[in-house]
Amino acid sequence: MLKLLLDEHISAGVANGVHRRNRSLVVHSMVQWESGNFLGKEDSVCLLEAAKQRLTLVTYDRRTIPPLLKVWAEEERSHGGVIFVDEKTISPADIGGLVRALISLVDEAGGMDWTNQVYFLRSGH
């Protein structure tokens, strides 16, 4: 089952919007998750705790996360999955667009095991 953790650069409004459209879906904003204790922490620390909680990270960060995932794959370390969003496809300011794309993805693939999955989100999913 897909459970989402939105990175700290994604508006908490996205988590609220996704939750309004699908109340059964677990979705956390990094700001609210674990009382904000992971804000500003290293990516590896956040990914490790997210994996423990079976959360899939949603992020625009295509600079630091991909190299980390490569290292983890080489070390045979598991993560809870990562969904990348491209700002040219869905602007960070387009809260409604990101909500719609995530809901579409959940409707289509929310039941699969997201462990170690990497997905590139498209507009409208």
Functional labels for PLM-detected ranges:
Residues A50-A51, L55-W72:
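Acidic, metal-binding active-site segment of PIN/NYN-like and related structure-specific nucleases
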Residues S35-A51:
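TIR-domain catalytic/interaction hotspot
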Residues L2-E8, A12-S24, H28-E34, S44, ...:
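Acidic, PIN/NYN-like endoribonuclease modules and their adjacent C-terminal/linker elements
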